[in-house]
Amino acid sequence: MKNVLPPFIEIYRALIATPSISATEASLDQSNASLITLLAGWFSDLGFNVEVQPVPGTRNKFNMLASSGHGAGGLLLAGHTDTVPFDDGRWTRDPFTLTEHDNKLYGLGTADMKGFFAFILDALRAVDVTQLKKPLYILATADEETSMAGARYFSETTALRPDCAIIGEPTSLQPIRAHKGHISNVVRVLGQSGHSSDPARGVNAIELMHDAIGHIMQLRDSLKARYHYEAFTVPYPTLNLGHIHGGDASNRICACCELHMDIRPLPGMTLNDLNGLLNDALAPVSERWPGRLTVAELHPPIPGYECPPDHQLVEVVEKLLGTKTDVVNYCTEAPFMQTLCPTLVLGPGSINQAHQPDEYLETRFIKPTRELITQVVHHFCWH
């Protein structure tokens, strides 16, 4: 059956040629159904049992779980099927045509991260999955680039508890065992409009927001002073004010002001605790101006994540690669997989190419990635 799989480069080419863009804007958002169908067919050809799950709350998005073997434990290899949108004017190549040039494979999703599935399929064509002593699972998720709805849904509904998981995000084959989380909120202040010639007849939302920002800055300083994780290049939780808008004319009292902000918490900091800290920080403004200040989520929050540094997965991967695990500031689906089993983020390609025009993966990653997948499957599913 394995001989019916296309060659590695043709699998890669087909994945890149199948659009699967995730976007919050409905006009740009695409279903990943065609890509899931491709993957499901190939993993079926390798002897896997394949289950395709609709992801609730999405625009026709699906997860795919391919499994082989029986019993407890085993290994989960995971990745997302979607890409970010692309700026056609900044690409010098067709984003949906795999192009090889100067030892690089160009195309949307080559590094982040549809290409990872080509590596898995290519490595497993030499493995008789029916003879595994422990289960092997391949998970392809939806909407990582926007809501992470696929990973959230899978982690909330599955009964699987593998021994460990590897998410093949582009880390330049540097194993990642921890990263910060991400919380994005909108702070809205509702004032009362009026003519600027008589300020007492209105409530200026910009002035109230100025007061609120002062308290938010105090929270930023408090987070920096109270929480520390030395391994990160920025070893404290960050708080950023990213966007503000209010008012519509210089001679009107501003009736509404809106601030977009984010917090990137360290591993171990709970989302509920952070929401509580933000609400506590803004309480003086809310008490002074009842009913005029609200805080809401802009996007579903992502917690920080950490795999125990002494776990067998860390030890095995560090030995195979001859390098120590690291930590990063960006987010992945790892916090959701970590609720099921210890998880590392580890894959070919550079994060510096993710979300960039003319995205590419260097061909030097092909051989070591194929070898790594073969080795981890052998270690966790044959022993």
UniProtKB/Swiss-Prot annotation:
Cellular localization per UniProt: Cytoplasm
Binding site for Zn(2+) 2: D112, E145, H355
UniProt entry tagged with the keyword Zinc: yes
Cofactor(s) listed: Zn(2+); Co(2+); glutathione
Pathway: Amino-acid biosynthesis; L-arginine biosynthesis; L-ornithine from N(2)-acetyl-L-ornithine (linear): step 1/1
Active-site residues, Swiss-Prot/TrEMBL: D82, E144
Binding site for Zn(2+) 1: H80, D112, E169
Pfam families (UniProt xref): M20_dimer (PF07687), Peptidase_M20 (PF01546)
Details of cofactor binding: Binds 2 Zn(2+) or Co(2+) ions per subunit.
Keywords: Amino-acid biosynthesis, Arginine biosynthesis, Cobalt, Cytoplasm, Hydrolase, Metal-binding, Zinc
PROSITE patterns noted in UniProt: ARGE_DAPE_CPG2_1, ARGE_DAPE_CPG2_2
CDD domains referenced in this protein's UniProt entry, alphabetically: M20_ArgE
Family according to the record: Belongs to the peptidase M20A family. ArgE subfamily.
Protein name per the record: Acetylornithine deacetylase
Organism: Salmonella arizonae (strain ATCC BAA-731 / CDC346-86 / RSK2980)
Gene name of the record: argE
